[in-house]
A protein has these predicted regions:
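Non-catalytic cap/lid and distal C-terminal segments of serine-dependent acyl enzymes
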Residues: 9-18, 24-271
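Twin-arginine (Tat) signal peptide motif
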Residues: 1-11
Length: 271
């Protein structure tokens, strides 16, 4: 069966592709990695049982320091399973020593909506305390996201700032330079776009390590290039590729290695 992916779907930050059906089975277990998952009720998403997943370096049997954690944000149409089923993010846990946590975020573009749903607050005020309770280091975290999640990673990093975020990776980020360009449903209205515009957040993002990866055939490439031009401190890679699982999977190892290095940097680049 062939599948046609429309430009409109891509511009919505969508990643709801046929292989998402594999999410229900979960990822294959990887040597040296412990996988756990669970659910919680969220006051930031009333009426929804929120799923989370965690991949962390396997316990060695001795007391070890709290492991640093990367929060991975899925794209439109995804869920907590998506980073495992698509880019197999768990494969990069043991080599880097980083834990990776995922959570359901819906299709709300990781910010507070008129409906009262706020997946960004869900991450900061509920997921991070949950992870801290499991012995992970959450005083400083890293963020990675794809498509809608790439936008969300930049947005949350700008809100938390350099003292809480060691580094952020935005892959094929769903970015728009004006409200009229944005996908239907990405923002409630023009004011919502302005309040959550990551272009205007670049002065904060300039104070922490930012990595941008986007394929040259991706429909978001123009906006990502424009974003990078106003953020010269970012590590930007615009190489051959499209808005596809193939491109995202190929970037993941280098991205996780890059994030592991950000934890050795000072907690803030500016006072």
């Amino acid at each position: 069966m062939s599948t046609t992916i429309t430009r409109r779907a891509l511009l919505a930050g969508a990643v709801a592709l046929p292989w998402l059906a594999a999410c229900s089975t979960g990822p294959d277990r990887t040597a040296g990695v412990d996988l756990t998952e669970g659910t919680f009720s969220s006051r930031f998403w009333p009426g929804h049982e929120v799923r989370w997943r965690l991949a962390r370096p396997a316990a060695s049997g001795s007391v070890a320091p709290a492991q640093p954690v990367v929060v991975a944000l899925h794209g439109h149409g995804g869920d907590a399973d998506w980073p495992f089923a698509s880019v197999h993010i768990e494969r990069h846990v043991a080599p880097t020593g980083l834990a990776v946590a995922t959570v359901d975020g819906g299709d709300f573009y990781w910010h507070a909506r008129r409906s009262g749903i706020d997946p960004g607050a869900l991450v900061v005020r509920e997921l991070l305390p949950l992870l801290a309770g499991k012995g992970l280091a959450t005083d400083r975290v890293a963020l990675i996201g794809w498509s809608m999640g790439g936008y969300g990673a930049l947005l949350l990093a700008s809100r938390l700032g350099p003292r809480r975020v060691s580094g952020v990776v935005a892959t094929s980020a769903a970015l728009w330079q004006s409200p009229g360009d944005s996908a239907p449903g990405a923002f409630d209205d023009r004011q919502d776009f302005v309040r959550n515009d990551v272009f205007s957040a670049r002065p904060v993002l300039a104070r922490l390590p930012v990595r941008l990866d986007c394929g040259s055939e991706d429909p978001f490439i123009a906006a990502n290039r424009a974003f990078a031009r106003g953020l010269p401190t970012a590590t930007a890679t615009f190489d051959p590729g499209a808005h596809t699982e193939t491109y995202w999977t190929a970037q993941a190892a280098a991205q996780m290695t890059w994030l592991s290095r950000t934890f050795t940097k000072p907690a803030a680049l500016l006072p």
